[in-house]
Amino acid sequence: MNGAESPHDVVVVGGGLAGCEAAYQLAQRGLRVRLVEMKPHRRTPAQTSDRLAELVCSNSLRGAALSNAVGLLKEELRRVGSLALRCADETSVPAGGALAVDRERFAEAMTRAIEAHPRITVEHREVTEIPAERPVILATGPLTSDALAASLAAAVGAEHLAYYDAIAPIVSADSIDWSRVWKQSRYGKGGAVRGDRAAQREQTAQPERAAPPEDAAERRDDAEAGDEAYVNCPFDEAQYKAFVQALVASEKVEARAFEEVRYFEGCLPCEVMAARGEQTLAFGPMKPVGLTDPRTGRRPYAVLQLRPEDEAATAYNLVGFQTRMKYAEQLRVFRMVPGLEEAEFLRMGSVHRNTFVDAPALLGPAMELRALPGVHLAGQIAGVEGYVESAAAGFLCAILLAQQLRNEPLRPPPPTTALGGILTHLGRKQPTYQPSNITWAHIAPLDPAHGKLRKRARYEVMAERALRDLDAWWAAG
């Protein structure tokens, strides 16, 4: 997939994993690239080094096994010539079943490869507005400067740009105890029972509580959701109170000095809501109005709802339960939820500083802003989460842009691959778009002809299919 020298110039803004990967892949395809990085003249509050591709938090690139979605993504990146994976493998350190790197040597290797490439020129200056040059890739990361973020917001609409993420956990469908839950959207949409308020009062043994003012909005949300019913995990009063107490008492992740997270009232961490009062959640995301447990014919005291994460409903997210609890605490507390006692968590919840756009609303198939042709986004600003995913997004943005510049039909990786799954996530419309690590829910499910497989076996078959399809796609290029 390498090409001859090209007259096209591409500007890449940001020298992190996504920007470096994008610049390298474009240069490998014969394009002259100008990579603009503001260090050493200015650093984000998280940065301490002047090198490119600085890993500011963990040195781990997470699990290596192919039965792990990120492990599959790493293997795919190796097979397509990723610079980040090559440097990671060269600078790896012992980490059990994970791929971890010596972060100093890794950054040195990435910087050396970029600076030595004959078709890449590195400029050190700050970019405070979207450059006039086209095409341009913005890969400015989660701590994009206020000035550049303001320029982007002015171009796409402030409502489509977020300054921190609020991620709820995701559980696998296979791990839900379906004997304890039921499917129904509020007021009977997609479920069994619809009734007026008087009928609901007759069906429940608990006193009627005033409905919150957002009921009308939730009715609209349910109508827009079509026939896709939520999964409802019911609580009695004792279970609810114990759950709230556990949320309040749980250990939380301390905000890093550079984050300065300011919560929006409409997207508070669940433990913050719980701390405001015992009934806050019961009048918020856990309110049971419009829901009837078919096993009892009554409305539960409280309900935690799960929403499908993918079309095949192989995974569900915990609606409204974005959290800053430590991961071990999330496992302990969320397994108190009826039906989730043995839940497998595909993604843990988090809340942290993160500048990103509403990718499904804004980006076209080449990761290009529909409102600004020639402006492409890569990395965390597009809505991926994690080192490996950022490098993957840089790779994808580069190869799609290269195809576009050559007037070739776009040839994205198949949706059966992890690389294709990154694009699936960026294009999948959600009620509230949030960044995500790669999960199996982003990858096309197996054909039903495979029959019922145990979880690990299913993932292994999906990985085999992914690598087979990836190799065929890559060879055809």
Curated annotation (Swiss-Prot):
InterPro entries: FAD/NAD-bd_sf, MnmG-rel, MnmG_N, TrmFO. The gene is trmFO. GO terms for cellular component: cytosol. FAD binds at residues 14-19. The keyword DNA-binding does not apply. GO terms for molecular function: flavin adenine dinucleotide binding; tRNA (uracil(54)-C5)-methyltransferase activity, 5,10-methylenetetrahydrofolate-dependent. This is Methylenetetrahydrofolate--tRNA-(uracil-5-)-methyltransferase TrmFO. It is an enzyme of class 2 (transferase). Disulfide bonds: none annotated.
